[in-house]
């Protein structure tokens, strides 16, 4: 079963400049993660490879709908809640709607986990048991606080990992337009960062580099900014 009751992200920020200042630590290999932000070597065909979205809540639904609007095909929607999965799959033209990760299409090479933070390791472990060409697959999650390494079960089977964090709040699964002009933090393996950066631009957002160490600081700062702004209203 897939757990996907993802709470709406509470990490909207009104000033992207403060985010970039918090993302300067070097990457896990000693390099600057910003080195991978350029998408010069990512072809349009690669960006448009079919995607599977796991989770049909506010974040998963909004992401899937935005992907479809930007002509990135969504091949499968996997969710523990079958009715929302079927509705989302119908809306985005996905051929597969299921509550079983074993139904992940074998030709999908881009997988997005839009599930609660505490469910990430378990869902990753379930996926890792699936007979799939993981060494040719990028697996991303959309958590603001958790690093890409939370998907370590998939790392062990050869997948490239990506944390793809939209710095935005999603109140409903239909908030496709909420991606307009936002920032998306990217962290993980080099292949994942390159893809995530190019995809963020495709969605109409601006990518910025994160490290596992800086993610929590950025998440907390954005949450405080969002909550502070709300308190002023």
Model-assigned labels for residue ranges:
Residues 92, 98-175:
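Rossmann-like NAD(P)(H) cofactor-binding subdomain of soluble oxidoreductases
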Residues 84-91, 176-218, 225-233:
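Internal alpha-helical scaffold of NAD(P)-dependent oxidoreductase catalytic cores
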Residues 75-79, 139-142, 184-187:
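Short, hydrophobic beta-strand segments that form beta-sheet elements in well-ordered domains
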Residues 47-50, 136, 181:
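Phosphate-coordination loops involved in phosphoryl transfer and adenosine-cofactor binding
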